[in-house]
Amino acid sequence: MTVNRPRGTRDFLPADTARRRYVESVMRNVVRNWGYSEIITPTFEHLDLFTLKSGEGIVGELYNFTDKGGRDMTLRPELTAPVMRLYVNELQPFPKPLKLFYFENCFRYERPQKGRFREFWQFGVELIGSGKSDSDAEVIALADALLKAVGIQGDMKLGNLAVIRTLLKGLEPEIVSKVMRLVDKKEYAGLESLLEEIGAEEQLKSDLFHLIHLEGKYILPKVKEIVGNIPELVGFEKTLKLLDAYGVDYSLDFGIARGLDYYTGMVFEVYAEGLGAQKQVCGGGSYQLIQLFGGGDVPSTGFGIGFDRIMEICPLVPPASKNLVLVSKPATHIEAVKVASELRNYLPVQIDLMERNFKAQFSYANTINADYVVIVGEKELEAGKLTLRDMVSGEQELLTLEEIIEKITGQQD
């Protein structure tokens, strides 16, 4: 019987894995330089964690199950809610703001397509405990810095949900949620039908459609004509000035609503070319989610980067590392093991594990593109030396182990 991997998942071969780990390390270094610390949360959580405020779209895609104790559990579909749960359980006494990041796999039962999988990896940041404009600006600027560090120049769109909610303040909360979802998906025909169905005033319909179609860097005066100079826009304008100071390139789009119901104010998304229909590589915003899980009314800002989508268009490749194969005969194999142990302090080393003859060992070294071969022969050992062959140039030298180490480490530098 052949058992294949589940639909919507992937296997990563050594070269793919090395590249992913390298890009991941670049991103980790960036966020650490901004003062963020890594956390890890469980792969599965209680179902309630995600049904409270994640939105209908995500709830319908959960990999949920009942465990042997009769508890409703689910594989995590995203990581903001688990981080908030972690904060309530463990981190409330810590000094604010808390600056956290994570890199974990998530699971959603959705139709697999280019750039979208049922198991996917998310790199994210959460800044907990500050609702100031400076915090929003830092988080957005950090997202921008991360994408630039991996060679991606994205198209950043910023909005503020307080603007749309000001327009919709006379509607029932469930209607507001429906409107926000339709706006987020840009289902304008469905939005128009919903507004007709609830008997919305013509002025509301006109203002809403005008607002969500406004785009550009300098549209705030037009936005104020629609909703007035509401307090949320004062802080938002300060955020924009700070982003200009950070050197972040952005445009405003008040049609951004995000697919998660817990965002409250500033929201942003970043799009990149080369991904087909799934162009979004990063999204986030400000939220107040902690009180849902038993904590206080703590403002937070964060974002998630779709790591799998990043990898489809990221130009980074790991720097090449030298590798070496030791060739020996049965009579010198023990010495070869000792030599390998010493050389592994300086570069990756492989020895023969298949009892191959000399010719087959050299053939294997060629097959794996080894940079060097060290021959551990009886004559070499009698002379207290080894033969180093450069597999690129073909040059061969009889050297002591110390000379080989010096030569190899010098070439690596």
From Swiss-Prot:
Its EC number is 6.1.1.21. It holds the Pfam family HGTP_anticodon. Its main location: cytoplasm. The keyword Transmembrane helix does not apply. It is found in: Cytoplasm. GO terms for cellular component: cytoplasm. PANTHER family: HISTIDINE--TRNA LIGASE, MITOCHONDRIAL-RELATED (PTHR43707:SF1), HISTIDYL-TRNA SYNTHETASE (PTHR43707). This is Histidine--tRNA ligase. It comes from Methanosarcina acetivorans (strain ATCC 35395 / DSM 2834 / JCM 12185 / C2A).
